[in-house]
């Protein structure tokens, strides 16, 4: 039989960090580090323009603002469907970036209660790829 996961009252909040380094015009090294309370997380890189568009939509569209009063939670919603899911520290080179472009690396951690009931705060790390 299939069992639904149990809910842990007062479970500690999940958090994570994102470090950006080794930038080239088309690549970036990202190190995602979850804390001990994080059982998994979603990550992605958005252009800074796309990231700001999502925040602005959450601030200005009443139907979205009602569901996501914190605009960053709207980004977390997209990460669940668009992002990569990880369970431990990841150190990766992201490729096929555009030279001279502003990006926002984002991460949405979750605790033992899962993504729906245990999502932590959005982690962000802005960076710009060099022109050459």
Which residues does each PLM region occupy?
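Extracellular fibronectin type III
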Residues: 1-9, 88-91, 110-132
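Proline-enriched interdomain boundary motifs that mark the N-terminal boundary
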Residues: 10-18
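Ser/Thr- and Asn-enriched, surface-exposed coil loops between beta-strands
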Residues: 19-29, 130
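Hydrophobic beta-strand core residues of beta-sandwich domains
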Residues: 22, 34, 97-98
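Solvent-exposed loop/turn segments flanking beta-strands in beta-repeat/beta-sandwich domains
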Residues: 29-68
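Non-globular, low-complexity intrinsically disordered regions
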Residues: 65-85
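Surface-exposed, short loops/turns at beta-strand junctions within beta-sandwich domains
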Residues: 80-87, 93-102
